[in-house]
A protein has these predicted regions:
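Pyridoxal 5′-phosphate
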Residues: 1-413
Length: 413
């Protein structure tokens, strides 16, 4: 893999969908924060599994079943290593949403009581809001929010003030905002939460695809993320957890594979991580996720971060040229990931996205599963461009050119 002196990546050919044309024009995919495109190595790994190794795992003693189990558990080991985690504290879930719900259910219902506080931030995805709302409604605990400043950042002073009250039982926060692009200082936040005697959870859905992640260095109690945003398949997510916390937790779901013994009136539980993986696993998806982290590891996440930082800086500079366009979030690329939300004055974001689609420029428009943040920002919705390792400056130029045409079409309101 060759790079330029600016650490740009040249991997577009690895992604089959990037060769697609619509109406004779190339696809400009700028919605990686919603889901990433998949390299051919991921597609082939899943195809190869189904063609040559398909069997259920953790059950059969015949060679095909053992081969499937080895592929699945080998993928788990590589996923754990990719994020600096231990294999047996790396739990496969359906997605990041399920991983967070697992914590809310299996940990929260044992530890959170009336009078306690669950602390989250105004920038959270609904997946890191609604499970805590449900928990607080059930237990009588209070849900509080850290404010988002006008520049899209959080205040650690406010975090300290909330923790000083002594009632915070759990704090949950995004590694990278899916709307603002803000990169939060999650290691520092987790350290302050632990010092106050509380538990922390990081939603890494946008962090793992964009940044080098070492869950040991971050040192949160839980770190949740999803495969499909990190070049992997849909249908699989990951929860990394602290061993002593996971061992003390009750299971999330009941059924096969998560048990050690079952009697007529009671059961005993399997070891980690299988205690939290009831039923037949997402085997092909696990194999695909293993291939995805192999691909990212081969690229080197430092290079991925450098590429997206440079592309984001270029995009911020180019977007500043578009009349009546306002970028929302941190002002420079150093403080944000490869996510840029914006509004074009007088034009609804959905109209912007529809017009860009005519040029095959794919962006997201809406509340981005972050309605409370939209209220904080005072907007009903935003348009959002987000980048992956396959994007280039030419994609940004196409975005800006298309936005200029949209601006000309609607005129100044």
């Amino acid at each position: 893999m060759e790079t330029t002196t600016t650490s740009a990546l040249d991997v577009r050919a690895d992604f089959p969908i990037m060769a697609r044309e619509i109406d004779g024009r190339p696809l400009i995919y700028l919605d990686s924060a919603a889901t990433s495109q998949k390299p051919v190595s991921v597609i082939e790994a899943m195809d190869r599994y189904y063609r040559h190794s398909n069997a259920n795992v953790h059950r059969g003693v015949y060679r095909l079943a053992q081969e499937a189990t080895d592929l699945f558990e080998g993928a788990r080991a590589r996923v754990a290593a990719f994020n600096g985690a231990e294999t047996d504290t790396t739990i496969f879930t359906r997605n990041a949403t399920e991983a967070i719900n697992l914590v809310a259910y299996a940990w929260g219902r044992e530890h959170v009581r009336a009078g306690d506080v669950v602390l989250i931030t105004q920038m959270e995805h609904h997946s890191n809001i609604v499970p805590w709302q449900l928990l607080c409604q059930e237990t009588g605990a209070e849900l509080r929010y850290l404010d988002v400043a006008d520049d899209g950042t959080l205040s650690l002073d406010q975090l300290d003030e909330e923790l000083a009250g002594g009632h915070v039982k759990l704090a949950a926060f995004a590694h990278v905002s899916n709307v603002l692009g803000t990169i939060n200082p999650v290691a520092e936040m987790a350290a302050r939460v632990r010092a106050a005697g509380a538990t922390s959870l990081v939603d890494g859905s946008q962090g793992v695809p964009q940044l080098p992640v070492d869950v040991g260095a971050i040192d949160a109690d839980f770190y949740a993320w999803t495969g499909h945003k990190a070049l992997g398949p849909t249908g699989i997510g990951v929860l990394h957890g602290r061993r002593d916390v996971l061992e003390a937790m009750r299971p999330f779901l009941g059924g096969g594979d998560m048990i050690r013994t079952v009697d007529f009136q009671e059961s005993t539980w399997n070891d980690l991580p299988w205690k939290f993986e009831a039923g037949t696993s997402m085997i092909a998806e696990g194999v695909g996720l293993g291939a995805a982290v192999d691909y990212l590891a081969n690229l080197d996440m430092e290079r991925v971060r450098a590429h997206e930082r440079q592309l984001t800086a270029y995009a911020l500079a180019r977007l500043a040229e578009v009349e009546s366009l306002r970028v929302i979030g941190p002002p420079d690329a150093d403080g944000r990931g490869g996510v840029i939300s914006f509004e074009l004055r007088g034009v609804h974001p959905h109209d912007v996205a529809e017009l860009l689609d005519r040029d095959n420029v794919c962006i997201r428009a809406g509340h981005h599963c972050a309605m409370p943040l939209m209220r904080r920002l005072g907007v009903p919705a935003t348009a959002r461009a987000s980048f992956g390792p396959y994007n280039t400056r030419a994609d940004v130029d196409a975005l800006v050119d298309s936005l200029g045409r949209a601006r000309d079409l609607f005129g100044e309101s």
